[in-house]
């Protein structure tokens, strides 16, 4: 005999074609009605091709009949915009006033940590003219979708990713756009991508305090920021501008991360501060937020990024960063 609990369990087994998440995880289930052994299920057709809709319909009938023999299943698809469906608990912007400090690296490592902790995580690459997220994750697939929405591409471990580079014919093709077009692209990535249910959406920002960061902080419901910097005096001076931008726009600074903090040489068991002494305490004081991590210059990490296997990286530094993150992120808002 069919029950509402059995139907809910069955729908968790129906995966969305092109992405290894269920129709429930993508929040495509709009409701269902159960009368005795007959069930009527409503799905959103957002970002789904006709063949994908047909597949979901067939798979749904198959799994529900497995829970209740002789069950009658009616299915309908409703038009919905991604913005009506997405349920994203936390949006965290990774920012810095300076270029080349490793925002994309910190964004990726943060996503990997949260993913390992069991959260559903996505990355919105807002660095429209200099995207590097797909390269680090080894992603080359073009996002699927249609006029009703776009499906993000998943990493090997299930992190959802959207980036302008995934839409280009060649990865080294230049995106020569002025500010308004960049702002529009970021807004579309937020409103037109079917993210589904996410615990965290991390936004990788380009350097500076102009159009792109402004669009993200004004348009997206940012719940917190992480500031990235390196030890150089010139860098920390510029990065403080990003701290002030976040503060002036009422966005909480969750913490600061010092990248390229040192080089560890195991042969002599020594940390060499290549770019000078750590400025973690100084930046923590300026941001009024904790120092979450000091990420070293690590040849292994650099190689994994170049090879597109950043998710294979594991180190004590990463574990320490994860423990620090757990003290500042709103873990109580976990959806699953």
Question: Which residue ranges define each predicted feature?
Answer:
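C-terminal lobe/tail of nucleotide-utilizing enzymes
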Residues: 2-4, 26, 45-59, 63, ...
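Residue-level signature of catalytic and energy-coupling elements of molecular machines
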Residues: 11, 29, 88, 99, ...
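Short edge beta-strands and adjacent turn/loop segments
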Residues: 17-41, 79-80, 295
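Phosphate-binding P-loop
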Residues: 83-89
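Walker A/P-loop phosphate-binding motif and the immediately C-terminal alpha-helix
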Residues: 91-125, 239, 243
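Phosphate-binding loop that captures ATP/GTP phosphates
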Residues: 114, 118-171, 176, 183, ...
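Switch II (G3) loop of P-loop NTPases
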Residues: 145, 164-180, 187-215
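Inter-motif core of Ras-like GTPase G domains
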Residues: 213-234
